[in-house]
Amino acid sequence: MLQVCYNTWKSAKKIHFCAKKREDLIMCGIVGYIGESQAAPILLDGLSKLEYRGYDSAGIAVYNGTEIEVVKSKGRLKVLSEMTHDGSMMPGTLGIGHTRWATHGEPSDINAHPHFNKDESIVVVHNGIIENYLKLKKKLEAKGYQFISDTDTEVIAHLLDYYYTGNPLQAVTKIMHRMEGSYALGIIFRDHPDELYAVRKDSPLIVGHTEGGNIIASDVPAVLKYTRDVFFIENEEIVRMTKDSMEFFTVDEEPLEKESTHIDWDVNAAEKGGYEHFMLKEMYEQPKAITDTFSPRVKEGKIVIDELGMTDEEIRGIKKIMIVACGSAYHTGVTSKYIFEGLARIPVEVDLASEFRYRDPIIEEGTMVIVISQSGETADSLAALREAKKRGARVLGIVNVVGSSIAREADNVMYTWAGPEIAVATTKAYSAQLVAHYLLAMKFAHVRGKLGDTELAAMLEDLRRLPEQVEMLLNNKQKIQKFANRYLAARDIFFIGRGIDYAISLEGSLKLKEISYIHSEAYAAGELKHGTISLIEEGTLVSAVLTQPELYKKMISNMVEVKTRGAFVMAVTNTGNTEVEKAADYVIYIPKTNKYFTNSLAIIPLQLFGYYVSIGRGCDVDKPRNLAKSVTVE
């Protein structure tokens, strides 16, 4: 029997719990290790690199030579570290660890991972959702299995027990045939103490060789300290590892040959590097992310995107572009629509990935679909990609993580070389995605004869100046911090813009609300009179973005409308547009650049504003409540 202990280390027993409340959510992180080193410190270190994914509880399991010892803790990893003295009190060189976002069963001591079978001889950690778990649970209960948690993961442990007859691989393949949904699994069998199993279906998982062992993880940052060469596990694949070997199998137990992928990310890029928060550090890394994304693709005054895999004739044959994404990536897609249509004269549709796959989209010959995702694992975007391919579209993925699912499944992939992004609220990956869109639109426009050599050269020169201009805006942070401190108690903040400026407003609003928890919405300024203006009252902050000269007069008119009704107006506009000062109470000027590139500059003060409002309110900037970095379930 298990003894449950609260906030106390009982060396003779194996289960330990602590408490903290959190909302139901969707994201998890897995780390597993087998080798010559002590497992627990490696598990804790790896899980700490996955904290950005969000979690409400954490746990590790280690085989200590005679039994599998499990330690679970609600709340932050530091509680788990304190309970185990940074893992030193858990001997053993085989283990699995987990950070959990609740999906089935509330965040609680019992529901935290790892989970085990009735005699604690099989231990499992799981990312994803088992859609038929209630049906499986009912059948297992009918056979005498008892459940102590409300999770779908415990069903996996008991199902393994039901099928296990001494052959772990056989048991794993049998449960895979029974389970419906998405999952990444790490599994330990007590009577096979020299083996660690990893399984994947629709939830990301990587494995890699370390010095003296092997490691599994949900994402690259967890393994950078130990290896740069990883294997990306594909759907319905199984990995059997010992400390010296790694074997890959299909769901039908057929052996597989796989090639590793080398990861060039700097290990220090996954650390704070002296900054107070990852988000602040990553904001300051935006100049480098912009440079690293465009520099390799501009050669001798020409845009060269070899990974696009398209001839000039094929580019000229594109009749429509559909852009599919979620969150901030969707906002870069909205920006891209204005640029592609303005420069290349190609009609563009922009869809939320969660809507695209269910609306029966019309994809005709000559349609190109662009799927955007920082992680390359976003579930809705991945499903949309598969739907587009099924309908015959050519699919280009724009992703940041090398070897990710979208990168592997798209016809072609264009990487944004932003490096690992840890903060949940994206900054540098967003900026790199914008640059990828700029390059694509300019390339298409030039090939299709809509952009001449002289115009292209001028735009490339403006693009080269962007990193320096971004850095200049970042160095103006004190002014923005002082202004942000005036709005720490704001109830509502609204963002307005027209054209590309509306796309900027969408992202500025999202940045603010996701990390400060202040209600915020972005509106196309022309829609104010159709209902939104009724929300404006005395003292309401309205952020107006106006970077498009042809829309200055219209925007200033909108600013006067809200100001007349008591709003305090903050404006973000181009240097030299002093007319705006007649309608704004506070103005932030950005350097002059090509009108299609203004998003890259106007977003910087809005990122800083959101950051400093959040800091002033005492919010967790890097890990805001109820959010995950990469949403890998629907």
What does each of the following model-derived ranges do?
Residues 16, 21-272, 276, 288-320, ...:
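Conserved short alpha-helical segments that host acidic/polar catalytic motifs at enzyme active sites
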Residues 93, 97-110, 299-312, 336-372, ...:
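Glycine-rich oxoanion-binding loops at beta->alpha junctions
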Residues 316-458, 462-465, 545-588, 609, ...:
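Glycine-rich phosphate-binding loops that contact phosphosugars or nucleotide phosphates
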Residues 286-290, 294-322, 412-541, 614-634:
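Active-site phosphate/pyrophosphate-binding segments
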Residues 568, 593-634:
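Generic C-terminus detector
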